[in-house]
Amino acid sequence: MIIGIWIDTPALGDTIAAIPTCKKISEAYQTKVAIFTTHPQIFLDQPWALCVQHPRSIETFIDIKIHRLFGPIVGKSYEMFGGEKIEWRYSNMDIRQFHAVSQGFTLTEEEMETKVYVSRPRELSNNGVIKDYVMIHPTQTWATRTWPEEM
């Protein structure tokens, strides 16, 4: 049986943030995994990736177990005692953990490292600049709650 991971988001940054969860799933099964994503260039050189395909090709695989990241919980809510609803919102937690939580686990601090491997030659434009690339600018973000407590 092939283990597959469907990264169910079209956003590039959110797709990159799925890398630690994909790696952990691969390690849990002790096998390389098939990746289904709209951003295959991010996963082409990952050592734990068996193959990288567009999500439309999932149905062509026989004997495959698919782990669907992100989509199963984004926007979902549950009702608390008393009727108040709580919504799963990825803007309120680390997006890397959001992918993991969609599979029922969390990542340790050591597992949160996000590595993008670029070992294949890339196509150059006429002026010698790489045509397609990803720039990652790690930084700190703003606080989720920015309004005064008195409100």
Predicted features along the sequence, with ranges:
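Catalytic machinery of carbohydrate-active enzymes
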Residues: M1-M151
